[in-house]
Every structure is written in C-alpha cells, then in structure tokens.
Regions:
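Aromatic-rich carbohydrate-recognition surfaces in CAZymes
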Residues: 5-12, 16-133, 146
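Conserved oxyanion/phosphate-binding beta-strand-loop segments in alpha/beta enzyme cores
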Residues: 1-3
Length: 176
C-alpha cells in the first residue's frame, strides 16, 4: 500500500482534496490509509508533514476536513471509525492554543500567535468533526463540536466589520 507525505494540508484542504475526492477516488483512499498509518505510528493525524516527519507548522487540523469530505463523498475506506477517533484526539490536544480556544471560545492574542486565523481554522475543522459525529450517532460530540464551530463569531467585530484579535477579552487596541 502506498504511503504519502507532504500533503501540505493547510494549502490543499480547500480545493485540491475536494477535487481529488471526486476524480481520484482510489488515490484518496490511499491518502486515508496514510493518515491512518500516521495516526497509528505518530500518535496523531497529520497537520503538515515534510518528508515523512511531523513539522508542527501550519495552523488548523485540516486532515479532518479531508476525511469528512471523503466520507460524505463515499470514498471506500474500511476504517473511518479509527480516523474519527483521531479527529477527536487532534481537536482536543493541549497545545497550539486549543485549551484557550475551548475555554474562551477564541484564542486570545496575548497567549498565542495567529490567534484569529487559528480560531477561524479550528472552527471550520470543528464543524467538520460535528458532521462526522452526527454521521456516527455520537450526540455528545456532535453538540460539543457544533458549538465550537460557532466560535468564529467570537472574533468578528461588528463595529469594524472585520475579524480581529481579542486581548484580555476586549478587542485588541493595536488592530488597524
């Protein structure tokens, strides 16, 4: 079974993988197998790997959107439940601003770089997880991740019309 690397998921989850899920269905199943191997051997789904190594760069956990899209487009793969467990795990790690995101409903700008971008990416990824939870009849996780999917609203400033950072619960004074 082929093993792939350098998915560059932050760059490809929006367009490349959804198209792959339509026209390269067998290859997508191979990608899912690689995700499963990375989960089993590395302890988490990929975020951004390079030459088979986890780099820790890029934001979000976009393998979940690739998996969700593949599932709902009917890509044959026998181990979606294992990938779903990996999705829950990666979305609940204790790093990259996730604890603050879960606590406050956004990532405070003084605690983590790229706070607004991470909040937006996590909210989308959580929406994907909520859809998988619903498909797997996992009501508690559906409710939790559906709520988290709404966190993008917490960084939208009605007065400026922009997504912007918050500092100590208030809009960051340095936003321009």
């Amino acid at each position: 079974i082929p093993n792939y690397t350098v998915f560059s998921l932050w760059d490809t989850f929006r367009a490349t993988h959804p198209v792959d899920n339509l026209i390269f269905r067998k290859k997508t199943a191979e990608f899912l197998n690689t995700f499963q191997n990375q989960l089993r051997n590395g302890g988490q789904l990929p975020i951004w790997d390079l030459a088979g190594n986890y780099t820790g760069c890029m934001i979000g956990y976009h393998s979940v959107s690739v998996i969700t899209d593949a599932y709902f487009k009917g890509i044959p793969f026998s181990n979606y439940p294992e990938l779903y467990e990996g999705m829950l795990s990666i979305a609940n790690r204790s790093k990259l601003g996730i604890p603050a995101y879960k606590r406050f409903g956004y990532i405070p700008s003084h605690s983590e770089s790229e706070s607004v971008s991470k909040t937006l990416e996590y909210a989308y990824n959580d929406w994907c997880i909520s859809k998988m939870a619903l498909a797997f009849s996992d009501t508690l996780n559906y409710l939790d991740f559906n709520k988290r999917a709404q966190f993008y609203k917490n960084v939208f400033n009605d007065k400026t019309g922009f997504m912007q950072p918050k500092y100590n619960g208030n809009w960051s004074p340095s936003f321009s």
